[in-house]
Design a protein with these regions (language model features):
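Aromatic-rich, lipid-facing transmembrane alpha helices and their immediate juxtamembrane interface loops
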Residues: 1-168
Length: 168
């Protein structure tokens, strides 16, 4: 009953939106169009994942792969609230900031972008597990969760970072 119910919207949405806009406009002002596009690609990947998450629920009639539990200012989709969408809008920008300038630099024979994608994906999985342990994120499928973190890693986050770095 809270899905897209605007009666729950709080004032903190306004400063959060301004932070996201500030980050993007600062990058544009610095001429970092590639970073802005990478951030939007990362954010777009989240929307893609949220759509297939909803389709899993729709066609299975059982449960989404992940769902939001607890308080939120605005629940946009079953697995996406306004706080998370703002976070993902900034995460793609942040994920490009520590990259080496040399796109072809390799570590142990593997392109550095794949290393960064793997490390950030693993960190993101750890954050998801903490959110799940805190009861803020619900998982109901055996192939997605603490006992199967590879689903979250390979389907949930690695594509986000890979697309972000490909665009960048």
């Amino acid at each position: 009953a809270v899905l897209r119910d605007t009666s729950h919207v709080s004032w903190m949405v306004i400063p959060m939106l301004l932070v996201v806009l500030y980050v993007y406009f600062m990058e544009l002002d610095r001429g970092n169009t590639g970073r802005v596009l990478a951030g939007l690609a990362f954010w777009g990947m989240d929307w893609f994942n949220e759509i297939w998450n909803g389709l899993v629920f729709h066609f299975s009639g059982h449960a989404p792969v992940w769902g939001i539990a607890g308080d939120t200012s605005l629940l946009l989709l079953m697995g996406l609230n306004i706080e998370i969408t703002f976070m993902f809008a900034i995460t793609g920008i942040m994920a490009t900031m520590g990259l080496p300038k040399d796109k072809k630099l390799k570590w142990l024979g593997v392109n550095n972008r794949w290393w960064f994608a793997a490390v950030f994906s693993a960190l993101s999985v750890c954050v998801e597990m903490m959110l799940n342990a805190a009861g803020m994120l619900v998982w109901d499928w055996p192939w997605w969760g603490r006992s199967a973190p590879w689903g979250i890693f390979f389907l949930g986050y690695l594509p986000f970072y890979a697309v972000c770095y490909w665009v960048y």
